[in-house]
Amino acid sequence: VTSPQVKYIHAGKIYDSNSGKYHSNKTIIISENIISSIEDGFIDPKNDKIELIDLKTKVLLPGLIDFHVHMESESGGKERYINRFQDSKADVAFKSTVVAKKTLLAGFTTVRDVGGSGVNIALRNAINKGVVDGPRIFTSGKTIATTGGHGDPTNGYRADLVEDPGPEDGVVNSISDARKAVRYRYKNGADLIKITATGGVMSMAKNGQNPQFTEEVMKAIVSTADDY
């Protein structure tokens, strides 16, 4: 029988977010990637199968959570717009793995990815399976918007270059469309539903304050999501 993977971390200081205080000279014991206990003092490993990580000069804190990220579009810089025309889904996926690792190394262990092409769902799955390094992801997959609204993926394009998007693409204009869009996201493995209920930087609206959904359509989205 293989013994469980155990790690000891010698922490100079640990920030306790519950009390708002720092605790000095602690040993964090990790068993099978789960923190099993935090002990006083610096405890030496019992055998050479236990990995020791020396962070006596460092300050440790619980993992941070970012509630609004877009892992697919964080890379690219000035070329981000032209990349929408040139990058395949594979290109987007490879670039998003780099962003995921940078996010984790920055201290964010959980993020909520609210809107993308659907690659964000595959990225979440790859991280959960240990294929790539990254934070725990809760994702909406593609957002849900109205025609011309904030989140319509065809905004800004000539009409002859793109087809009229529908519920699977995240564009709805009726109660029936709304229910179908939510069901597509459930089918594709989304953790949550994102709707862009008002205008924004990606919409054709003159301002971001006016509603873009009817109340009936929003109720249909919420009630359908609640079914799952």
How should each PLM-predicted stretch be described?
Residues H70, S140-I144, T198:
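Active-site beta-loop-alpha junctions enriched in small/polar residues
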Residues P4-Q5:
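Boundary of Sec targeting at the N-terminus
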Residues I14, S19-L61:
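Histidine-rich, glycine-flanked metal-binding segment
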Residues G12, I28, N33, T57, ...:
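Divalent metal-coordination and catalytic microenvironments
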Residues Y81-F94, Y157-K180:
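Active-site mouth loops of central-metabolism enzymes
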Residues N125, K129-T146, G208-Y228:
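Alpha-helix-loop-beta-strand connector modules within alpha/beta enzyme cores
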Residues D177-Y228:
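Histidine/acidic residue-rich metal-binding segments in metalloenzymes
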